Amino acid sequence: MLIPWQELSPETLENLIESFVLREGTDYGEHERTLEQKVADVKRQLQCGEAVLVWSELHETVNIMPRSQFRE
């Protein structure tokens, strides 16, 4: 089930994004990016619709995923 990110408090959204970024592991790109940069990137992806917040009833967890990978 999709969760409208706009309906979350800014603090809750920030915490969800930080948790997601920290779970994603180490970035082995050419340039190391700060946590703040990664959080800003995910927030931008949510705002422009590239990513969505998804509630899993089975696992009772929230995840962030590319919109193209979400299947209802």
UniProtKB/Swiss-Prot annotation:
Gene3D superfamilies, per database record: YehU-like (1.10.10.610)
Disulfide linkage: none
UniProt superkingdom: Bacteria
InterPro entries xrefs: UPF0270 (IPR010648), YehU-like_sf (IPR036685)
Family as reported in the entry's similarity comment: Belongs to the UPF0270 family.
Protein's name according to its UniProt entry: UPF0270 protein YheU
Annotated gene: yheU
